[in-house]
């Protein structure tokens, strides 16, 4: 191999990062671009959110220069999957590179800020780069006309999809979409939502008011790197490949590659062959590889040939490039391109290769869409094995035994089918319509017909349904060939298909997947049958079907319909602004939004690593109840990186094995000696880097024993059977209302022992659990923690280490999303990190990988409710009894609070009388904890399930039953006591009536009925639900300090987790000190800085939870300002005697000279008579359900929420929209599944699907209702962080209405004794659940009826 025998030299990677040159020599070949950026450069914008290419937090722009053409190619990429060596001689641009504090912000960053599109901010740099990349891509299209000044060439449709691969858990996406669309030249600016650039309805929406955009303003490829590349090319031409000292090889020909294969060091287990490395996002590396061979530089693998017979794509052509080539082709090619646009996300498609996808499908049970659609198109592949080149059909290639790593896929040929009498269609069913989600089933069908629509040839390909690879349904193909389509023929084809498509044992949703395959085939064949000019009696499913046929066939236009998923996203916001307390009440933009967008905002993992820093990763139990006998490691490269393992034995004398604690008993930090649930921490691996620690933890081998142990308790049913409960303290127990037996005696009708279930939900904060511990002198330690509860974190660390609280300093600046998951659950990571640092006397950092975080998180409480309800014939309910089982997990955590929250939310209706039996079950699963609207969202759902059951039993309109059982103020006081407040503040009834009783609602309901009567395969539903949510006020500290120059520093007990706490506090500070300023304080806004929480600086900080932290922090700041105004007023009056106006700076300078204490630090406690109050809202949602797939599109949601007098309408709007969309996830697609041992198996972005931009309502309207002033509340404001989440119940209820319409149509019933319209739908209502309720066999039964009707009038089935 030329120089192979010589001494190996370490290659140097040269790249530009934001225009600056970097060299990396001797870097491990497994190092990702993200790791390099975050550890070897000042860049912190790209974040590690998942490590799978599934979240977009790490997106960067990569630019490559071709000296032969003098052209630069730019594309977005997922830096967590991109290997550093693969971007040698490339330029990388991050969010800091397009704009920052010093150089000025880019219009993308300014508009994200101005449209209120950043909350916690952790996802914002990735969003920023996805938008920027989309603009660059559009503006580089020379075939498009130049846009008007300030706009891009991007279209609104493209803009909406620009962030389709990016996840955000905070905003609900609507403001992000508006930001994207603001750049589109075809946008109507008046349609964009609330922003800081113009006042809607008062000022014209003009592009001149937006931060000016100029394409090409950012240089993405510096000239110095171009010169280096040109110079290097002259030097290295024809130089043979050399041995690599750092293990990275990049052959330039197939011959060079085979010489590497023949090397003595080549070994399948330690050498990884890569083109883009995106496959590691699906199949994670279990060990470190010490050698990589990059085949992307082999020219033969990058060929693109088009002729009149086929398109040939080299195996390392990116999926994005393949889409570009195929889009400019015939029907089949364009359809393939359309389907590939739904594979992964833009930033993954840009680097993922077409051949890599096919090779994964060949070697592994990978649910490839690429293989399926290419299989149906009759593709062939060329492979090289040793010196032989072989050609196979794709079907033959997939069916071969898995290829070894020496088998090289060269290219893929897709034949030209022409367009005469050819029909090609592809299908996929996935939780996200735009992609970024693996499909339950995918399929592609190609048919060639004669002029009379006789099927001459047909190919039916199915994939992702639970077998090793895509297959062709050949028996069905053979049956259909030569036949004309009829209902009978299609039915027989489906019967054959069901024998062919058989998921392997262990496949989830087995029957659903078969039903999907049937639905897809039916959709294709019925459409084909109806494409004839001859009439057909088969109802074709709605959707877009395009056929290109000969001229003697009627135009296909009659078959094209607009898919609901393609509707543009629209919105409307209504709110009232008040100047009463200005600048409080103004919709100012979020503090720090620009630095969040630029990536300069510092989160825990962004803090530069201290000298000698070590890194930790958890080893967790995979058994639910077992003795832990030992921890060892496999012999591997990763295990060689282990420095030590920290366990319970390392807890100092006097310390406690404690990881969290709340209210009652705590939870152990380590399983010792028994692991009590799968996912429990057993030990912490310590290594030199986070990647080494994470990889070493995977290599841990734990020896377990179940000797003398009882079987684990995993479910509510297990716990009840074995009397395993957590006791509820009497002071936390909810109280019943009235005499249940008397209420039941008054009822005309009764429903007894009906049951409904709700599963768990994962927080999916974008920043996983993180901590950095730095040991200090005299047994002191400082911990930077991503926590909602610094005070508790401090206390627990001190107890764990056995040192005084004052030795522990916990600092938390900002948190990248919390939702309750950074409260009790954050303390485990902080305690483990602190213990390791304390033991080793070196700084230790932990940043959990997404899988570990998901396995250990616990999440929302699963529960089961059994209810008995009595009611009158008019729908008035007289009595309700509820048996409630709550799965708490292994420790109490917040679980004792759950019954009160659940019953509190349930009480939104007047049940007449109410009694309940609640059991908080102790089980061998990870402790469940507080998650946004804990208990309330479940209680509200249970209430709606009961109301809908009653309405169904009486055949009454559901809203009529809801309205009849809403409280009047008298009954509200009976159910809620003092929390009901004043009658003037009870706004629920008026909000509900505004939505449910409006003429518009009645019109929409009538239109839905009309739609359902004329559409067999898609049904719509609409529902309006009320919400009542009780919140509690807690004591909180605050401190306002005025510096000598007049700038102001503020400390509060609350933590900025994205909820806009700092923004509201800043406004309140300006308002509170405004009496000292001529303009009422607005001049002070820019002088206020809210600083990070520090447990040794501000004690008794409490927790950031329960939705009221912002208002209580604001109130304590206001009181601080009152104290400061009292001190400063005499000086102000003295100065005013000499001058009419007093400048702020002069006032403070004089006060400082007079030695006035310019700091105030009160501790606010709520009035004993007003510790809680009620929040109200109502929400209407309209959905469309695809009966054939179970997919749901939310067509419109209208929310009316009572914010009182909002402290900041922009912030509160963001909270309302964001938590509503989080609720949509809970009720629809978020399936937090565990295995039979209770171990979470939906543990990453591939299997756990939070909402993306394609899941939000197509029309999303919010009205912020201003209820009567209430001086007991903080400036008459109300909470917004959690209550609106329960309004997402409206989506679930609307889905039920749509499903009910389908069940009526197809006479679907769960049992012969039950009506088709009465059924329970548990949470989450995923696609398989919806499809099953609509009927898994509706297609077969429909075709049987049609066939029977065709055969004769007396043979049709009912």
From Swiss-Prot:
Enzyme superclass (EC): oxidoreductase
Subcellular location: Cytoplasm
Catalytic activity field: indole-3-acetaldehyde + O2 + H2O = (indol-3-yl)acetate + H2O2 + H(+)
ATP-binding is among the record's keywords: no
EC number(s) from the headed UniProt entry: 1.2.3.7
Expression sites (tissue/organ): Mostly expressed in roots, and, to a lower extent, in mesocotyl, leaves and coleoptile. Accumulates in apical region of maize coleoptiles (at protein level).
Molecular functions per Gene Ontology: 2 iron, 2 sulfur cluster binding; FAD binding; indole-3-acetaldehyde oxidase activity; iron ion binding; molybdopterin cofactor binding; oxidoreductase activity
InterPro entries, alphabetized: 2Fe-2S-bd, 2Fe-2S-bd_dom_sf, 2Fe-2S_ferredoxin-like_sf, 2Fe-2S_ferredoxin-type, 2Fe2S_fd_BS, Ald_Oxase/Xan_DH_a/b, Ald_Oxase/Xan_DH_a/b_sf, Ald_Oxase/xanthine_DH-like
Region (Disordered): 532-559
One term under GO cellular component: cytoplasm
Cofactor(s) demanded: [2Fe-2S] cluster; FAD; Mo-molybdopterin
GO biological process: abscisic acid biosynthetic process; auxin biosynthetic process
Activity control summary: Inhibited by 2-mercaptoethanol, p-chloromercuribenzoate, and iodoacetate.
Gene3D superfamilies attached to this UniProt entry: 3.10.20.30, 3.30.465.10, [2Fe-2S]-binding domain, Aldehyde oxidase/xanthine dehydrogenase, a/b hammerhead, Aldehyde oxidase/xanthine dehydrogenase, molybdopterin binding domain, CO dehydrogenase flavoprotein, C-terminal domain
Occurrences of domain 2Fe-2S ferredoxin-type (ranges): 11-98
Record text on cofactor binding: Binds 2 [2Fe-2S] clusters. Binds 1 Mo-molybdopterin (Mo-MPT) cofactor per subunit.
UniProt binding sites for [2Fe-2S] cluster: 50, 55, 58
Polar residues: bias regions: 537-554
Main location: cytoplasm
Domain FAD-binding PCMH-type, first and last residues per copy: 241-419
Cited function: In higher plants aldehyde oxidases (AO) appear to be homo- and heterodimeric assemblies of AO subunits with probably different physiological functions. Involved in the biosynthesis of auxin from (indol-3-yl)acetaldehyde. Can also use indole-3-aldehyde and benzaldehyde as substrate.
The protein's assembly and partners: Aldehyde oxidases (AO) are homodimers and heterodimers of AO subunits.
Full protein name: Indole-3-acetaldehyde oxidase
Organism of provenance: Zea mays (Maize)
């Amino acid at each position: 191999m030329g120089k192979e025998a010589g001494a190996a030299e370490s290659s140097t990677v040269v790249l530009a990062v934001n225009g600056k040159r970097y060299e990396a020599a001797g870097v491990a070949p497994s190092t990702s671009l993200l790791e390099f950026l975050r550890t070897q450069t000042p860049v912190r914008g790209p974040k590690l959110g998942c490590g799978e290419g599934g979240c977009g937090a790490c997106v960067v722009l990569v630019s490559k220069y071709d000296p032969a053409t003098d052209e630069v190619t730019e594309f977005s990429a997922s830096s967590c999957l991109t290997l550093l060596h693969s971007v040698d001689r490339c330029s990388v641009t991050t969010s800091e590179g397009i704009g920052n504090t010093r150089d000025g912000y880019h219009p993308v960053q300014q508009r994200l800020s101005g449209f209120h599109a950043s909350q916690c901010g952790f996802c914002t740099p990735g969003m920023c780069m996805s938008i920027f990349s989309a603009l660059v891509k559009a503006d580089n299209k020379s075939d498009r006309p130049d846009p008007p000044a300030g706009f891009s060439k991007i279209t609104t449709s493209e803009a909406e999809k620009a962030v389709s691969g990016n996840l955000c858990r905070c905003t609900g996406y609507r403001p992000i979409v508006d930001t994207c669309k603001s750049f589109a030249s075809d946008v109507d600016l008046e349609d964009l939502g609330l922003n800081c650039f113009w006042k809607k309805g008062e000022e014209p929406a003009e592009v001149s008011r937006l931060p000016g955009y100029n394409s090409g303003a950012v240089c993405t490829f510096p000239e110095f790197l171009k010169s280096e590349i040109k110079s290097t090319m002259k030097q290295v031409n024809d130089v043979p490949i050399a041995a690599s000292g750092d293990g990275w090889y990049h052959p330039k020909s197939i011959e060079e590659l085979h010489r590497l294969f023949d090397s003595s060091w080549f070994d399948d287990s330690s050498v990884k062959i890569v083109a883009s490395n995106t496959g590691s996002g699906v199949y994670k590396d279990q060990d470190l590889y010490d050698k990589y061979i990059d085949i992307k530089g082999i020219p033969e693998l990058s060929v693109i040939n088009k002729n009149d017979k086929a398109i040939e794509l080299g195996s390392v052509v990116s999926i994005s490039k393949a889409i570009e080539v195929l889009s400019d082709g015939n029907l089949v090619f364009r359809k393939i391109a359309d389907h590939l646009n739904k594979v992964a996300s833009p930033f993954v498609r840009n680097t993922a290769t077409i051949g890599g996808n096919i090779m994964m499908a060949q070697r592994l049970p990978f649910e490839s869409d690429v293989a399926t659609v290419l299989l149906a198109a009759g593709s062939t592949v060329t492979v090289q094995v040793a010196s032989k080149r072989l050609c196979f059909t794709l079907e033959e290639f997939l069916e071969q035994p898995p290829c070894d790593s020496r088998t090289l896929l060269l290219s893929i040929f897709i034949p030209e089918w022409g367009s005469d009498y050819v029909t090609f269609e592809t299908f996929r069913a996935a939780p996200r319509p735009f992609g970024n989600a693996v499909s339950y089933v995918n399929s592609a069908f190609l048919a060639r017909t004669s002029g009379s629509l006789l099927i001459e040839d047909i190919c039916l390909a199915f994939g992702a349904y639970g077998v090793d690879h895509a297959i062709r349904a050949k028996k069905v193909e053979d049956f259909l060939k030569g036949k004309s389509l009829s209902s009978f023929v299609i039915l027989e084809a489906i019967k054959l298909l069901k024998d062919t498509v058989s998921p392997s044992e262990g496949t989830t949703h087995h029957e659903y997947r078969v039903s999907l395959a049937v639905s897809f085939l039916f959709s294709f064949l019925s459409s084909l049958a109806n494409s004839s000019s001859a009439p057909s009696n088969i109802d074709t499913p709605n959707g877009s079907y395009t056929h290109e046929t000969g001229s003697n066939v009627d135009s296909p236009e009659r078959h094209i319909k607009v898919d609901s998923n393609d509707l543009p996203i629209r919105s409307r916001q209504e709110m009232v602004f008040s100047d009463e307390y200005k600048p409080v009440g103004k919709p100012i933009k979020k503090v720090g939004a620009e630095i969040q967008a630029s990536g300069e905002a510092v989160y825990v993992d962004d803090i530069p690593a201290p000298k000698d820093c070590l890194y930790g990763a958890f080893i967790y139990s995979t058994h639910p109840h077992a003795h832990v006998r030992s921890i060892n490691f496999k012999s591997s490269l990763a295990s060689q990186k282990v420095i030590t393992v920290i366990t319970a034995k390392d807890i100092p004398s006097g310390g406690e094995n404690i990881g969290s604690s709340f209210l009652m008993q705590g939870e152990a930090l380590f399983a010792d000696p028994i692991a009590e649930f799968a996912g429990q921490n057993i030990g912490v691996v310590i290594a030199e880097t986070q990647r080494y620690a994470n990889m070493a933890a995977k290599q841990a081998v734990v020896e377990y024993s179940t000797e003398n142990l009882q079987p684990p308790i995993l479910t509510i049913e297990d716990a009840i059977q074995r009397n395993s409960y957590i006791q509820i303290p009497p002071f936390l127990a909810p109280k019943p209302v009235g005499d249940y037996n008397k209420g039941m005696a008054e009822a005309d009708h009764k429903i007894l022992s009906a049951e409904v279930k709700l599963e768990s939900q994962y927080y999916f904060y974008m920043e996983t659990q993180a901590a950095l511990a730095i040991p200090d002198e005299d047994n002191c330690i400082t911990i930077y923690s991503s926590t909602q509860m610094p005070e508790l974190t401090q206390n627990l660390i001190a107890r764990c280490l056995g040192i005084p609280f004052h030795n522990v300093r916990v600092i938390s600046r900002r948190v990248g999303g919390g939702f309750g998951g950074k409260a009790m659950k954050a303390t485990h990571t902080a305690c483990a990190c602190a213990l390791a640092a304390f033991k080793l006397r070196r700084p230790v950092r932990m940043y959990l990988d997404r899988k570990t975080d998901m396995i250990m998180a616990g999440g929302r409480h699963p529960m089961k409710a059994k209810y008995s309800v009595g009611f009158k014939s008019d729908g008035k309910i007289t009595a309700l009894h509820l048996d409630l089982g709550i799965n708490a997990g292994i420790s109490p955590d917040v679980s004792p609070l759950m019954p009160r929250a659940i019953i509190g939310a349930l009480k939104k209706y007047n049940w007449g009388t109410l009694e309940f039996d609640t059991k908080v079950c102790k089980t061998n699963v990870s402790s469940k904890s507080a998650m946004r609207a804990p208990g309330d969202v479940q209680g509200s759902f249970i209430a709606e399930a009961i109301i809908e059951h009653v309405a169904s039993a009486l055949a009454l309109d559901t809203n009529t039953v809801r309205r009849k059982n809403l409280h009047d103020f008298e009954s509200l006081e009976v159910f809620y006591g003092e929390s009901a407040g004043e009658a003037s503040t009870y706004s629920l009834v008026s909000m509900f009536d505004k939505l449910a009783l409006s003429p518009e609602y009645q019109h929409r309901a009538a239109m839905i009925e009309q739609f359902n009567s004329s559409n067999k395969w898609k049904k719509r539903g609409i529902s309006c639900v009320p919400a009542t949510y009780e919140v509690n006020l807690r004591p909180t500290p605050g401190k306002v300090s005025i510096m000598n120059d007049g700038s102001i520093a503020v400390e509060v007990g609350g933590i900025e987790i994205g909820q806009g706490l700092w923004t509201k506090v800043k406004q309140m500070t300006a308002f509170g000190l405004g009496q000292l300023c001529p303009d009422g304080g607005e001049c002070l806004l820019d002088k206020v800085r809210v600083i990070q929480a520090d447990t040794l600086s501000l004690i008794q900080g409490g927790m950031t939870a329960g939705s009221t932290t912002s208002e209580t922090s604001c109130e304590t700041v206001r009181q601080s300002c009152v104290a400061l105004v009292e001190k400063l007023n005499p000086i102000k009056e003295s100065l005013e005697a000499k001058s009419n106006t007093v400048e702020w700076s002069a006032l403070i300078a004089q006060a400082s000279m007079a030695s006035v204490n310019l700091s105030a630090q009160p501790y606010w406690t709520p009035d004993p008579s007003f510790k809680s109050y009620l929040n109200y809202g109502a929400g209407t949602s309209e959905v469309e359900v695809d009966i054939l797939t179970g997919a749901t599109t939310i067509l419109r949601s209208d929310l009316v929420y009572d914010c009182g007098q909002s402290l900041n309408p922009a912030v509160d709007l963001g909270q309302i929209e964001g938590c509503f969309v989080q609720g949509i996830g809970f009720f629809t697609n978020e399936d937090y599944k565990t295995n039979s041992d209770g171990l979470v198996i939906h543990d990453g972005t591939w299997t756990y699907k939070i909402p993306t931009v394609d899941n939000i309502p197509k029309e999303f309207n919010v009205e912020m209702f201003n209820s009567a002033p209430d001086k007991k509340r903080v400036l008459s404001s109300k909470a917004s962080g959690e209550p609106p989440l329960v309004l997402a119940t409206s989506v679930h209820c609307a889905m039920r209405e749509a499903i009910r319409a389908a069940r009526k149509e197809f006479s679907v019933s769960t049992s012969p004794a039950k009506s088709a319209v009465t059924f329970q739908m548990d949470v989450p209502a995923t696609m398989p659940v919806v499809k099953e309720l609509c009927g898994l066999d509706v297609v077969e039964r429909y075709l049987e009826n049609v066939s029977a009707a065709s055969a004769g009038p007396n043979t049709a089935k009912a």
